[in-house]
């Protein structure tokens, strides 16, 4: 699997928690701040944090834990 992305914003405590969960799950994702892109902000504004797989376009919305991340990546 390639292209794992975590969408969030700065000063988002849930996004910080999501990053910790990814670390716990051993997953590496590119962090993209949606506040820097109007289209992303419109699409994800109230849904963040969201984990997205670039290969499939599948998304995992918050809340998630390490087990859910592992299942998502399987």
Predicted segments with their positions:
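Thiol-based oxidoreductase modules, predominantly thioredoxin-like and allied folds used
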Residues: 28-38, 45
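Non-catalytic, surface beta->alpha helical segment in thiol-disulfide oxidoreductase systems
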Residues: 55-74
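Structural micro-motif
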Residues: 45-51
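Small/polar loops that bind or transfer phosphate-bearing groups
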Residues: 7, 32, 61
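Local sequence-structure signature of Cys/Sec-based thiol-disulfide redox active-site neighborhoods
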Residues: 1-25
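Short amphipathic alpha-helix with an adjacent loop that forms part of the alpha/beta core around
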Residues: 42-43, 70
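Short beta->alpha linker loops
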Residues: 10, 35-36, 64
């Amino acid at each position: 699997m390639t292209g794992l992305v975590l969408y969030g914003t700065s000063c988002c405590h849930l996004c910080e928690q999501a990053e910790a969960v990814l670390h716990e799950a051993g997953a590496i994702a590119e962090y993209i701040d949606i506040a820097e892109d109007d289209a992303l902000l419109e699409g994800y504004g109230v849904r963040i944090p969201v984990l997205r797989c670039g290969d499939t376009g599948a998304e995992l919305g918050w809340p998630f834990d390490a087990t859910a991340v592992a299942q998502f990546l399987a």
